[in-house]
From Swiss-Prot:
Top-level taxon of the source organism: Eukaryota
Protein name listed in UniProt: Potassium voltage-gated channel subfamily E member 2
Topological type in the membrane: Single-pass type I membrane protein; Single-pass membrane protein
Keyword check for Cell membrane: yes
Organism: Rattus norvegicus
Family label: Belongs to the potassium channel KCNE family.
Glycosylation sites (chain numbering): 6, 29
Location in the cell: Cell membrane; Apical cell membrane
GO CC field: apical plasma membrane; cell surface; membrane; plasma membrane; voltage-gated potassium channel complex
Gene that this polypeptide is encoded by: Kcne2
Taxonomic lineage: Eukaryota, Metazoa, Chordata, Craniata, Vertebrata
Length: 123
């Protein structure tokens, strides 16, 4: 089992050495201008840039959500006296119960279309 562990360790070290050697040679294959630019970028700290972007995106999202909520609230208040909304708000179960209690007052009307008496319904 120790030989397997040694083999694994040896392979890992070999792959790591090849990869690091390749990356170092690839990185050295740059011009002086690219190296100067890379040194300047490495010297700068981008943590504050990321923080700034997060704050700006957060403020923008807060403003958008506030506008959305205020618009929805104003539309809800604007249409509160609309007959459609009053229709929904009313308690229809109570109306049905009151109609059932007064069955003696109910009336039925039958309407007949005399012009359509010659037509038959096809199966």
């Amino acid at each position: 089992m120790t030989t397997l562990a040694n083999l694994t360790q040896t392979l890992e070290d070999a792959f790591k050495k090849v990869f690091i050697t390749y990356m170092d040679s690839w990185r050295r294959n740059t011009t002086a201008e690219q190296q100067a630019l890379q040194a300047r970028v490495d010297a700068e700290n981008f943590y504050y840039v990321i923080l700034y972007l997060m704050v700006m995106i957060g403020m923008f999202a807060f403003i958008v959500v506030a506008i959305l909520v205020s618009t929805v609230k104003s539309k809800r208040r604007e249409h509160s006296q609309d007959p459609y909304h009053q229709y929904i708000v009313e308690d229809w179960q109570q109306k049905y119960r009151s109609q059932i209690l007064h069955l003696e007052d109910s009336k039925a009307t039958i309407h007949e279309n005399l012009g359509a008496t010659g037509f038959t319904v096809s199966p």
